[in-house]
């Protein structure tokens, strides 16, 4: 099943950077899509994630081997408004429906600066 998460209003305006760590589920790959709503845009709109043996159905995910080289992403946010929100999904349609072509992901360390 594809996952979808939407933040609250960001409360910042203008152009910013969005950085985070993300991996796909053990033995899988995934594409993580990011969308800006309520004003603004993001580039790129998706990133490819590698599978990590620590990303399983058994949290906490203490055994994920995070890598700055393969798992850390920085995207450009443009023209944000104070009410802009971010939506993260493993579905290009941003729906939480069963879809065998999408993968699961673990996202952490999200920063806007």
Write out the residue ranges for each language-model feature.
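Terminal, low-complexity interaction segments
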Residues: 27, 42-113
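Short, surface-exposed linear patches
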Residues: 18, 40-43
């Amino acid at each position: 099943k594809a996952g979808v998460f939407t933040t609250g209003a960001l409360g910042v305006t203008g152009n910013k950077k969005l950085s985070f760590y993300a991996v796909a589920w053990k033995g899988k790959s995934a594409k993580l899509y990011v969308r800006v709503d309520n004003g603004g845009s993001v580039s790129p709109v998706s990133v490819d994630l590698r599978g990590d043996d620590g990303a399983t159905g058994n949290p906490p995910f203490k055994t994920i081997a995070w890598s700055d080289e393969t798992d850390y992403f920085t995207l450009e946010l443009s023209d944000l408004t104070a009410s802009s929100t971010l939506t993260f999904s493993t579905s290009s349609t941003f729906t939480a429906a069963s879809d065998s072509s999408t993968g699961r992901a673990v996202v952490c360390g999200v920063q806007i600066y």
